[in-house]
Amino acid sequence: YNTYIFNETIRQNFMLAKENVTEDEIYTALKKVNLYNFIVDNGGLDKVITEDAANISGGQKQRLALAINLVANKDIYIFDEATSNIDIDSEAIIMNNIKELSKEKSVIVISHRLANVVAADTIYFIEDGEVKEHGTHNELMNMHEGYAKLYTTQKKLEEGYTEVIA
């Protein structure tokens, strides 16, 4: 199931993932992604999402897509850059839900931001279309190769960014 937010009501978007979805299931999923109050305060489940979800923020769109996926209840989930171009709060909500989901389901996370995959059972470091390294975060860090170098660089950049805005 490839999540796309359609120009329909929120309820109808959930029904595309699970035809017989209940309001309780929808509200539970919305609470998990911290959208419950926003949806209830802005038209409820009958709120129409405009073309390309232009009437909600990028973070809200990503969290709504995740909520729809949670209701779909599949065995395998693939998240491809699930936290790209969103605010830090939305990123934390999404990653916490993905981590929780991975306790019961098979989850594949594709991410350029390595901080999002540190807790993964296995990380595949791909460069130029080829798997160059694989292992846990600690194993890859101990190799002192591509993954470790990129992770360290990203961490330094993020720490520098935090210092600049603090």
Describe the predicted segments one by one.
Residues 11-51, 95-96, 104:
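ABC ATPase nucleotide-binding domain helical subdomain, centered on the C-loop/LSGGQ "ABC signature"
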Residues 36-64, 157-166:
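ABC-fold ATPase nucleotide-binding domain signature/coupling loops
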Residues 77-81:
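Catalytic Walker B motif of ABC-type/P-loop ATPase nucleotide-binding domains
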Residues 100-109, 117:
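Conserved catalytic loops of ABC-family nucleotide-binding domains
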